[in-house]
A protein has these predicted regions:
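Short terminal alpha-helical segments
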Residues: 1-35
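Amphipathic alpha-helical coiled-coil segments with heptad-repeat character
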Residues: 3-6, 17, 24, 42, ...
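A structural signal for well-ordered alpha-helices, especially hydrophobic packing surfaces
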Residues: 10-13, 17, 35-42, 56-63, ...
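Short, charged, amphipathic alpha-helical segments
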Residues: 25-29, 49-54, 74, 78, ...
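Short, charged early-sequence alpha-helical segments and their helix-coil boundaries
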Residues: 40-59, 69-72, 98
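Amphipathic alpha-helical hairpins
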Residues: 55, 64-68, 72-82
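Amphipathic alpha-helical binding modules
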Residues: 74-110
């Protein structure tokens, strides 16, 4: 289930017309790293993983929609960043990846 949801995010990013190819490549690389980190903790932190993936889906949706709503976009990024806070000590790479994704999407001005 989680891998399918992450694959849908990947497809959404690949199909986006609003993201430059170089930025898209970096986001897809970060998503690949996120998949690895999520897989590593999915058995021990299943509820956290559900939240992370859920907010990642929302963030991807808001970032790639044609009629953008800045308020919903900001809320989705805040939710995504908040979803990993409890894992900062035990899984710093996961937190780094999520924070990098949030910053990159935010900086793109999507």
């Amino acid at each position: 289930m989680i891998p399918d949801r992450l694959n849908k995010i990947e497809e959404k990013l690949k199909q986006s017309q609003s993201i430059k190819e170089s930025d898209k490549a970096e986001l897809l690389d970060l998503l690949s790293k996120l998949k690895t980190e999520i897989t590593d903790i999915s058995d021990t932190h299943s509820e956290d993983v559900e939240s992370i993936v859920g907010f990642a889906e929302l963030s991807a949706h808001e970032a790639t929609r044609s009629d953008k709503n800045p308020e919903l976009f900001d809320l989705s990024l805040k939710g995504l960043a908040s979803s990993v806070q409890s894992l900062e000590m035990s899984h710093p790479m996961l937190v780094f990846i999520i924070n990098r994704i949030c910053k990159m999407i935010s900086d793109l001005g999507i």
